[in-house]
Design a protein with these regions (language model features):
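Non-heme Fe(II)-dependent double-stranded beta-helix
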Residues: 7-10, 16, 27-31, 35, ...
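Short, conserved beta-strand element in jelly-roll/cupin
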Residues: 238-257, 349-350, 380-383
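Extended hydrophobic/aromatic segments used for targeting, binding, or gating
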Residues: 379, 384-404
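Extracellular structured ligand-interaction cores
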Residues: 130-132, 234, 243-249, 259, ...
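Double-stranded beta-helix
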Residues: 258-362
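A short hydrophobic beta-strand segment most commonly corresponding to one strand
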Residues: 247-250, 266, 372-387
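A short secondary-structure junction signal
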Residues: 218-222, 230, 247, 258-267, ...
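Short beta-strand His + acidic residue motifs that chelate non-heme Fe in jelly-roll/DSBH
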Residues: 362-370
C-alpha cells in the first residue's frame, strides 16, 4: 500500500493569508511539472544497479538540471521582493550541488532498491523495514559513560544563554575515552556494522551531542500565538536537513512520556514523496533562515513568525512551501493530526534506551520535555572517506542503462 507523505495545507492555516500574487496557482502547477522532470532525471540514478560517483552524476545530469533549475527560478521569483529573490537564488545554487550529490549517495544502495541482497544484520533489517532499530545497551557500560560525561553535564547546566536554548553541548570527537566508549557500546549491539550494511559503505563517528531537555524550554512552543493557534500536538516532527549520515539516540536517564521521548513514524522513510522536491525545499529552508533574520523570539524557526516572510512563503508555488519540520504547522484536530497520531511510535526507556535511524528520510522528533528533565546523547555518523564498498554489486553498466532510461 502506497502511503503519501504528509503535506501541510497552509491555505487553511490561520497564521497564513492566501497568496497576494494572482499567478500563484498557475505557477504551482508548472513548478510541480519541473519537480517531475527532476525526478525523471535523478530517480534512475538513485536506484542504479551500480554505485555512481558524484562527479559522474554531475556530468550526466548537468545540462538537464540547469534547465530545470532555471525554470524553477522563474516560477519561484514571481511575486517576490528582493530579499526572497536573493534567498531563492542562494537555495538554487545549493540545490545544484546537493541534488547530484544526494543521487550519487543513494546510488550506493542500489541492491537495497532492487532487492538483490537481503539484509543480514538486525540493525539493517530494522532500518529498512521501519526506519529505526531499537535496543537496550549494556547497563554497566552505559553507567561508565554517564560517569565520564558528568563534567560535561555540569557544563550544560551552567549554560543558560539564549544562544544555547537547546541546552546542548556538541563534541566533534577526537580519540578519547568518551568517544571510544560510545563506539564500543554501539559496536556491542551491531549498530556501526548495520549502518555499513544498510548504506553500503563504512560509517565513522562524526559528532555527538549531549542534550538536556526540561519543561522550562520554550524553543518549540507557541510559534503562532499571534494568530490564536496553540502549540501543535505534532510539533517538531521532522526529517533532518542533510541527506547523508545516520544517527543514534541514547537515553542517559529514565524516559517516560513526561520526559520528551524519542518518537518516530515507522515506515515513513518509504512513504511516497518526491525526494527531489524534498532536497530542493531543504535548501530553500536553509536560505530562508539566513535571509529572514528574527532576533525577537526564542522559537527555533524564527523566520516563520515574521508576517512579511509568511506572505513571501504563500506566494511561492504550493509544493515549495513544504517544510522539513512540518509538525509545528499541523493544526490540532485536522486529518493530518489524526494521521500522525495514529502512526507514531513512542520509545520509552523501558522499551529501549538506544535508537539507530536514518533521520534524513525517516520522520521523527524528541526532546519535548513536558514534566521532567531528560538527558540524552545524540550520535552522528558520516561516510568514511575513501571507505571500501561493502556489498557485492551486479556487474551491469549503470551508465548505459541510465542513459537509455532517461529518454
Amino acid at each position: 500500500v502506497t502511503i503519501p507523505y504528509p503535506v501541510v495545507d497552509y491555505d487553511v492555516h490561520p497564521a497564513f493569508e492566501g497568496p497576494s500574487d494572482a499567478s500563484q496557482p498557475e505557477r504551482s502547477a508548472a513548478f510541480a511539472a519541473v519537480i517531475g522532470q527532476l525526478d525523471e532525471l535523478f530517480e534512475p540514478i538513485r536506484s542504479s544497479d551500480q554505485p555512481l560517483s558524484e562527479q559522474r552524476v554531475r556530468r550526466m545530469s548537468q545540462a538537464r538540471l540547469t534547465r530545470c533549475l532555471d525554470d524553477a527560478r522563474r516560477l519561484l521569483h514571481a511575486g517576490q521582493g528582493p530579499r526572497e529573490i536573493e534567498a531563492i537564488d542562494a537555495a538554487l545554487a545549493d540545490a545544484a550541488i546537493q541534488l547530484p550529490a544526494e543521487a550519487a549517495y543513494r546510488s550506493r544502495m542500489g541492491e537495497r532498491n532492487h532487492g538483490a541482497s537481503p539484509f543480514v544484520s538486525p540493525v539493517a533489517r530494522a532500518i529498512d523495514e521501519t526506519g529505526a532499530f531499537e535496543c537496550q545497551l549494556d547497563a554497566d557500560g552505559k553507567q561508565r559513560l554517564i560517569d565520564l560525561l558528568e563534567p560535561r553535564r555540569r557544563l550544560v547546566d551552567e549554560q543558560r544563554s539564549k544562544h544555547n536554548f537547546y541546552k546542548a553541548l556538541t563534541i566533534v570527537p577526537q580519540r578519547g575515552p568518551e568517544a571510544d566508549l560510545v563506539v564500543d557500546l554501539l559496536n556491542d549491539v551491531g549498530i556501526p556494522a548495520g549502518f555499513a550494511e544498510f548504506f553500503n559503505r563504512k560509517m565513522s563517528l562524526h559528532f555527538w551531542t549531549l542534550i538536556r531537555s526540561d519543561p522550562t524550554e520554550v524553543w518549540w512552543k507557541d510559534p503562532y500565538r499571534d494568530a490564536g493557534v496553540s502549540t501543535s500536538p505534532t510539533t517538531y516532527f521532522h526529517v533532518d536537513a542533510r541527506f547523508e549520515g545516520p544517527k543514534v539516540m541514547i537515553y542517559l536517564s529514565d524516559v517516560t512520556d513526561e520526559h520528551g521521548p524519542f518518537e518516530y513514524l515507522p515506515g515513513s522513510h518509504r512513504w511516497d514523496r518526491s525526494i527531489s522536491l524534498e532536497i530542493l525545499n531543504k535548501q530553500i529552508e536553509r536560505a530562508h533562515k539566513k535571509a529572514w533574520v528574527n532576533e525577537n523570539t526564542a522559537y527555533y524557526r524564527p523566520y516563520m513568525q515574521l508576517e512579511e516572510f509568511r506572505s513571501a512563503l504563500m506566494n511561492l508555488p504550493t509544493p515549495a512551501r513544504q517544510q522539513s519540520h512540518f509538525g509545528d504547522d499541523v493544526l490540532e484536530g485536522s486529518e493530518l493530526h489524526a494521521f500522525v497520531e495514529s502512526n507514531k511510535r513512542t520509545v520509552l526507556s523501558k522499551i529501549a534506551d538506544c535508537v539507530a535511524f536514518d533521520g534524513n528520510r525517516m520522520t521523527h522528533r524528541g526532546a519535548l520535555a513536558g514534566g521532567a528533565t531528560r538527558w540524552a546523547l545524540q550520535v552522528g555518523f558520516e561516510p568514511t572517506p575513501g571507505a571500501a564498498r561493502t556489498a557485492v554489486r551486479r556487474g551491469r553498466s549503470a551508465a548505459a542503462s541510465l542513459l537509455g532510461r532517461k529518454g
